[in-house]
UniProtKB/Swiss-Prot annotation:
PANTHER family: LEUCINE ZIPPER PROTEIN 4 (PTHR22550:SF5), SPORE GERMINATION PROTEIN (PTHR22550). This is Spore germination protein KA. Residues 9-33, 504-523 have a biased composition (Basic and acidic residues). Disulfide bonds: none annotated. It is a multi-pass membrane protein. It is found in: Cell membrane. It comes from Bacillus subtilis (strain 168). Pfam families: GerA. GO terms for biological process: spore germination. GO terms for cellular component: plasma membrane. Involved in the germination response to the combination of glucose, fructose, L-asparagine, and KCl.
Length: 544
């Protein structure tokens, strides 16, 4: 009892300490003046008080106008601004304009002095500091109770490159960057329509991360939009460093291995999903964009499916789904067959497997778990190592460990083949989030097969499908258009029909503008051949 009281007192003291720190932060915010002062000296002092001794915050005081009567201060953060813009479009025009009068300095600078596109006046300290942290420059003038915010964002950024996680043999070669505005502009180049709306907000009480919600007005479901806006407004956290934060805070189901939001770094993928009625969430500082509502079949679709012929795309999609289930159940089937159901194995194959396992001291389940864990370690090591040696380590390591394990009699050659086939099959899933889900579920199926044989495996598969059917992505059934079945949605699910036959958007996603193309879009080869023959006949007659 005393120990319990001591722990409770420690918890209460920690809660009280956290409450005191929170109250202290709120008190400091209250002490900061809401509006700027007409005194330039006070404004500079308030800025220094807020940013502390940060060496990258530049405060440059200059005197301009006739006889230097106007006293200004230009404040910006080095590294977040474009230095050429600061000097050529900000400092130089201010110094050269001698017509500026002290009584109307801010108004004159705003209206005619600066050639910058984005300049606006502001009085609120909160807004000014927020813009300063974004890379914009501030101009204060002595005797004026408002400052100017100048658009000077710049600094070093990664150039547009080919996506590294979603490589395509056909299609655009550009991927998203870490710049929010650049990513938005890349999507707008695909969808040149005023109904493509972008709503920006800031999340993270400390980081103040910019987030953009993008959708096509009139195509995206209004109920889904209302739901996602409510979930985004509810977010109250100190930092947002990557889109994964947002995904985990707004997804429908937390306790599931299956992803209920799709992420990509390809602008054409985002554009295609927006045109189907989905929305996208873009986070500043990351090239990965979130897309929802997400469906189970969506994770087996690749961008080049839509750039290739429908028959080729259909065959590859079916192959991906089959390979996905092979990666799920292959080790479990081997464990169940060799442990409980030897009568189902052909006699000659059973004799070969029995001869291989004669010197193996462990049961099949231990073999499977050991090799699976070893392959997962090698795969993780290959990802974390430098790219030059990572792939070599994973491949060579797998060969060496597999051969050594067989020679040592720890595992059988058949088990090495099964695990290797499973590892290769997992790479065929286009979406990494779905592939890693299979890697986790595979262990559950192996244990179920070791306990109950094929009965345990079948029970596990049934439970998995029941769980999949219970999932929702922003209210949309995760297994649609298969469950519930949709005749229109199934045209672009496990297989893809020709473009001329896919007249409407997916019913489970888009409730507004469902029609995406006109009727009678099917090409008429017979008529085309007739036209060609007619042209040839007319040409022959003219020649004679």
């Amino acid at each position: 009892m005393p120990l319990f009281s001591k722990r409770k007192n420690n918890t209460d003291s920690k809660d009280k300490q956290n409450t005191d720190e929170r109250n202290q932060e709120q008190q400091q915010e209250k002490e900061r003046p809401v509006l700027i002062s007409p005194s330039l000296a006070k404004n500079i002092a308030e800025t220094k008080k807020e940013v502390g001794s940060s060496s990258d915050v530049i405060i440059r005081e200059i005197k301009i106008g006739e006889q230097d009567h106007v006293h200004l201060a230009v404040i910006y953060i080095s590294g977040l601004v474009d230095n050429n813009t600061i000097h050529e479009s900000l400092i130089d025009p201010l110094v050269q304009d001698e017509s500026i009068q002290n009584t109307h300095a801010i108004q004159q600078i705003l209206e005619k002095t600066l050639p910058l596109g984005g300049v606006k006046a502001e009085k609120s300290w909160d807004k000014l500091f927020s813009e300063l942290m974004l890379g914009n420059a501030l101009i204060f003038a002595d005797g004026h109770d408002e400052a100017l915010i100048c658009s000077t964002q710049g600094g070093e950024q990664r150039s547009i490159q080919e996506p590294s996680t979603q490589v395509s043999f056909r299609g655009p070669r550009q991927g998203f960057t870490e710049s929010l505005q650049t990513n938005i502009s890349m999507i707008r180049r695909y969808i040149k329509n005023p109904n493509l709306w972008v709503e920006k907000m800031k999340k993270g009480s400390v980081t103040n991360t910019d987030i953009a919600l993008m959708y096509i007005q009139g195509i995206c479901d209004e109920k889904v939009l209302k739901e996602v806006k409510q979930r985004l407004e509810k977010i109250d956290i100190d930092s947002i460093l990557e889109s994964g934060y947002i995904e985990q805070l707004i997804e429908d189901e937390t306790f599931t291995t299956f992803p209920t939001m799709y992420h990509t770094e390809r602008p054409d993928v985002v554009a295609g999903n927006l045109l189907e009625g989905r929305f996208a969430i873009i986070v500043d500082g990351t090239p990965f964009v979130l897309i929802a509502p997400a469906l189970f079949v969506q994770f087996f679709q690749s961008v080049e499916d839509y750039y290739s012929r429908f028959d080729i795309a259909t065959s590859i999609r079916i192959l991906r789904v089959l390979v996905f289930f092979i990666s799920l159940v292959a080790p479990a089937v081997y464990v169940a067959a060799t442990t409980f159901h030897q009568e189902m194995i052909p006699t000659q194959l059973l004799v070969v497997i029995a001869a291989q396992r004669e010197i193996v001291p462990f049961p099949a389940v231990v073999e499977a778990l050991t090799m699976e864990v070893a392959f997962e370690i090698l795969r993780e090591a290959g990802v974390r190592l430098p790219r030059v040696v990572g792939s070599a380590v994973s491949i060579v390591g797998a060969l060496v460990i597999g051969q050594a394990a067989v020679q040592a009699g720890i595992v059988s050659p058949a088990m090495v083949i099964i695990v290797a086939l499973t590892a290769i099959a997992s790479f065929a899933t286009p979406a990494f989030a779905m592939a890693i889900s299979a890697r986790l579920i595979r262990f559950i199926f192996i244990i179920a097969s070791a306990v109950m044989g094929f009965y345990g495996l079948i029970l596990g598969i049934i439970m998995m499908f029941v769980h999949l059917c219970s999932l929702r992505s922003f209210g949309v059934p995760y297994m649609s258009p298969l469950a519930p079945f949709s005749s229109q949605g199934v045209k672009d699910a496990l297989f893809r029909v020709p473009w001329w036959a896919d007249e409407k958007r997916p019913e489970s996603v888009s409730k507004e503008d469902k029609v995406r193309q006109g009727k009678d879009q099917r090409p008429e080869p017979a008529a085309s051949r007739g036209m060609v023959n007619k042209d040839l006949e007319e040409g022959d007659q003219n020649g004679t």
